[in-house]
Amino acid sequence: MSESILEEAQRLIHGERNKNYGHPRENFKDIALLFSGYLEKEISDIDVANLMILMKIARVKGTGYHRDSFTDMAGYAGCVERIYEEPVEGEPRQWDTLADVPKDVKTVRSAGNAFWSRYPDYNERLWGHRDGFKLDHAKISEGPFVEVLGE
């Protein structure tokens, strides 16, 4: 059996849609700002989803059943769920010197792309290198030191 409309919408909003347009929180906020300017009335991210769903309803009303339209409607509803139910990632903090970094911050990245991590057994930070980041040996110990979120 092929996937249902709801399963397809879920796959798209967490996969291809997310890859192409980013998290709906930012994308719908951008659309809301544009709609607000055009309409000269403040529009929210939920309004964006509702308006897009209404557009799909208008198409279906005029042309009849098209699976894609109903998948899109489910996708817009799923995007609203993601906006309001998924945790917001904070902005990474940064410090000028390694000594300024609070003890509760596990890992920071230096200007030279060295990753400095605090280990519970040591009273200092140790640095390492990660794939995908070109290490600049001259700046390993230079700021700014940017917090690595999620660690």
Curated annotation (Swiss-Prot):
InterPro entries for the chain: DUF6378
Superkingdom of origin organism:
Viruses
A Pfam family it matches:
DUF6378
What's the protein here called? Gene 55 protein
